[in-house]
């Protein structure tokens, strides 16, 4: 972004007006009355200390308040609403985009005392906490119960959960597991008027929309997070890291391409390129590749062998390390690189930003970064997440050079423009904030930006929750016409089905394309679409299944259906152009996550025309596992016992037939090695149980047959004893088959749901935001 494009942080003219100052003074008095004088500060030092983060941006508040609990938080937000004063939540201030800085002054609300762990469920794998809880604390609580919380940004020791949710934080392991949004089960959100909304995972199945998707990555523009319930995954049985050293950057990039072309998916795949030092073509610096491997022992052993062979084939020197040795080795290597860079260039400081391109474009993007470094005259390192195309170009600079800021911004703008041309995104984990606001119009067509503005109005009609972030105003967006038009032209898509193997992506541009069609297109290759809708047949349309919000047989492992959606196209109103949501990058946190709302949209947001879906490696072994018939309550106890063994089930539950008999039913899968050892563990857990273990097509599993479409709707209700047992008995008594899914935490059957739709007024406003005609 150039200086001319950059907003004046914290210097909004309206914020300097006498009426604004008077409103802030009134709000300060309200806050003192609510919290006490010691929790409300407006002195110059406090204001300065909360005017910056890890970016180059600045934004000065009028006052800073520190609530003690959710009641305080709601009261503060309600007071700000009453006085018409903007507010912004602030955690640890580690953001790289200025997201937690006040663009229009007003009140900064600190989450430092909202730091309680509210609940830890080690049986179900859930943690509920307040927004000020440090990420490392969540990780520690998870580890004590044998679980892991996967998002792991580099600031994990100080950053907070509220900030992670607001920015949709990722980290190295977002490659294998996805960003923060994939792990949010529920959010308590204080709306900008002080009221409280609870958004949870069940809403898409109960007539609502999955509004959690909007909160993750919204940068606090839709309200204040009061608490978040987070999904945990089982701690891996085995964990190693392959470190490979390459003399040439091109060979490291070729290794990355082959890794994905052959269908490998490491839990993390990061790269540290050789340094680019202008005027020093002789500067020799190796490139390093770090591949994280997590999972069951068979998976890690198989992946490490394959990765090492690929690295050697491209001239790399691989070595396999345990985690402590890797962390020490990486710290030494990075420290040495930085010291040598500073010594060679004379530039002691660095500027870090992020951008994203499809991983198939990584080699071209590295060439673009090299050209931008030469054009700017800046020495550059690039430590980045090679597996998902999320780059972190890091130019070094001399702060005493009066032109350094302009050169840094010109460098970042040049790289981002190149990403745009490759079909990339503005951000993969840092967010938009103030830093990239002026570039949103170049990456998003006007109709998509208008939907985002309408979503903002639906949550925040008065525009008080962190205004001036994420979405440019209509006036700002109007300035980018020619480049927007070029992007719109590129959105013309060829009908049919297209597989992009290195990107592990399938593009479906025809509602007639079925799951069988996708399977045929992927046959013989290393990838699969991990989605078989419960009770469906392979002849079902993929787009129809997503639009209906049909639950997956395999859920949440390896992925929830909504988390497979990288991009989607909607026809909203007759005569209007299709609106494009998301894109085709494995990692994308630019703007609101509108694309995930199409899961369960049921035509209410528009007609779903196209989707871009993430693919995953095929399992090397997949077995159907079923216990004998037994009473319902006995089957529930056996299912709970089996869950404690931490076996690689992609789904597990209790299947109740129409005749009333029940059995524990599931499927185990590995992506590397065989299941033989795990089947032995299963037998040892329940020695008296004669398990029936078979192979076969998932589409013909007993659960799929029991819930097959009979002309009635697929209905469900939240699971949980003793209500769950009574529900299963009632369904069996009525001659209906049912499946209690531990992954969904829900009971499924064919017929009428037991309770009315949970469509809220907020859902209605979001639907209107999509349907409204563009300005």
Language-model features and meaning:
Residues 1-78, 94-125, 154, 230-232, ...:
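N-terminal flexible segment immediately upstream of the FAD-binding catalytic core
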